[in-house]
Amino acid sequence: MYNFNEAEYRTNLTRQIDTFGQGVELAKEITKDGYSNIFFIAVGGTVAMMMHFEEIAKQLTTIPVYAEQAGEIVLTGHRHLNRDSLIIMGSKSGDTKETVAAAKWIKDNYGCRIASMVISKESPLGRLTDYQLPLVVFKGVEYEYLSVFGLFYGLLHLHNDFPQINAFEEQLKKLPDLLVAAQAKFDAPAAKIAARYYQSPYLMWIGGGELWGEIYLFTMCILEEMQWMKTKSIKSSEFFHGTLELVDENTDVFLVKSVGAARALDDRVERFLNQYGKNVVIIDIKDYMGDIDDAFAPILAPVFSTAVLNGRLSKYFEKNTGHDLNMRRYYRQFDY
């Protein structure tokens, strides 16, 4: 596969999966001390990743779970935020200014416990963190999901909402093989897609359910930030309430199909696109998940989505555009 170090990828995934038990132990400590609700708070791609947990929580638990934008919550507040709230934050660098400011605001105003997905405990966010969620590498969103899984599903298990936690952990052990296989399967399609669409003036991306955060993340953080490509992301549930009018024979449209309860919405969009679109790419994440148990497929779908989209398609866009994924005009280049 192009620009892919399989041995390193397998090693890092295994190291990250091995931290699952640490997250469960944190969940035991937090549950023993008690908590009233869970707030996921971050910005950008990290809060996009967190949207998945909010969506899954609606379906699995009565624990109130919120995903909030760090730059907004310090201005608007939240009536459900209280001293007993558990805050889950994330900033790989540990110095994302809005996230650090939100952590300080939370500590100063509420004194909440904060669990953070951060590499260094000595970073600005790390120093405000009570529980560090292990993160073994800087790049790769799949590692971010895996970093949070132990704590989140440990909390749900201890709340009697996720009795299948041991079976879930066994599923995680399959991921090194299955994620490599998924990327190998999508490698040739990714090369063809990128070669055809890398010069597109406008890319529409549609998705929903447990994958909505992934669609938002890939369009904004990868295609826009890292490739300077103009995109539109829209939920499958919202597509028929305006955005459908933009579809014609010249519109480049991507639909990423989810595997959970909202899949029927993706199916409806697919039928419309097949009838009225000309330049349509359908990426069905279910096709890349191997023998993952159906019970865990919605939980793990974003891990596979990020593996094929970020892991394969972004690399081929980079190859075709000649635009290094690390190049920025503005982001972190100066104060603004």
Question: Which residues fall in each region the model found?
Answer:
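Glycine-rich phosphate-binding loops that contact phosphosugars or nucleotide phosphates
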Residues: 36-171, 256-283
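Internal helical hairpin/lid segments
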Residues: 213-281
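Short amphipathic alpha-helix with an adjacent loop that forms part of the alpha/beta core around
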Residues: 27-31, 75-82, 243-248
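Glycine-rich, charge-decorated loop segments at or immediately adjacent to ligand/cofactor-binding or catalytic sites
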Residues: 120-133, 243-246, 289-299
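Active-site phosphate/pyrophosphate-binding segments
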Residues: 2-37, 139-140, 147, 154-234, ...
